[in-house]
Curated annotation (Swiss-Prot):
One of its GO terms (cellular component) is cytosol. Its main location: cytoplasm. (S)-2,3,4,5-tetrahydrodipicolinate binds at residues 160, 169-170. Pathway: Amino-acid biosynthesis; L-lysine biosynthesis via DAP pathway; (S)-tetrahydrodipicolinate from L-aspartate: step 4/4. This is 4-hydroxy-tetrahydrodipicolinate reductase.
Amino acid sequence: MHDANIRVAIAGAGGRMGRQLIQAALALEGVQLGAALEREGSSLLGSDAGELAGAGKTGVTVQSSLDAVKDDFDVFIDFTRPEGTLNHLAFCRQHGKGMVIGTTGFDEAGKQAIRDAAADIAIVFAANFSVGVNVMLKLLEKAAKVMGDYTDIEIIEAHHRHKVDAPSGTALAMGEAIAHALDKDLKDCAVYSRESHTGERVPGTIGFATVRAGDIVGEHTAMFADIGERLEITHKASSRMTFANGAVRSAFWLSGKESGLFDMRDVLDLNSL
C-alpha cells in the first residue's frame, strides 16, 4: 500500500524537462513537490518552482544544494546528464533516498554504479518513461521471437537538435529488447554507422540510424524487413509531459520499497504479460 504524499525532488528544475516534471508532480494525487534543484550559479536560484513551471506559487524555492533540502524529499527525480546524476546517486545512496533516473548516455561504469547503489536504495532506471514506449518494447520482444531470425532489423530514431547523445537511450533499449529475445548480446550484433563501400548487409545484425532536427520530441521505429513484406513498429511522442507523468508515477510506485533496481516494465507490470 502506498503512503500518502510521497515527496519528490526535481533535478534540473529550470530545464525543459525539469519544468514539466514539476507540473506533473503538482498534478498527481499522492505526490508532493518537496524540492527543486538547479546548478550552482544559476539565475533561477531562489525562484518559486511552481511559478518557474507556470503552475502558480508553491512555496518551494529552487536550491543548488542537496544538503539544504535533504529532509524535504523521499524520492529524487533526475533527467540531467550522467556526471551530475552520478553525484546525485551517491548522495541519495548515503541518505537512503529513492531515485527515478531518466538520464541517458551512461557508460558501462555509470550503469554499474547504478546497479551497485540499488543494493541499498530503490531505483527506477529507464531509457524512456512513456507508457507507449514500454508497451512497444514488449511488442518488439514478441515480434523478434517470431520474425527476428529471418528478417533484416533496423532501428530508426529522431530527436530535436539539442539532444546530446546518439543513438538515443530508447533506441538502445529497443535494440537490447530485440537482441535479448534472440539470445544475443547487442554489443555483438549492433551496427551504428554505415558509410563508403560497406558491402552487403551482414545477416543477424541490428542497424541503427539517427536523425537530429528541429524540435522533434522523440520518434522511434523498429523495422523487421523481409523480401515481400516489412513490419514496422513505431512510437511518436508529441509532448515531454508523457515522460514527466511516467517519471512521477514511478516515484509514487517506489513508495515502500527499500532497495532494488526497477524499470518501467516493473512499474506498469508488463513483465506479467
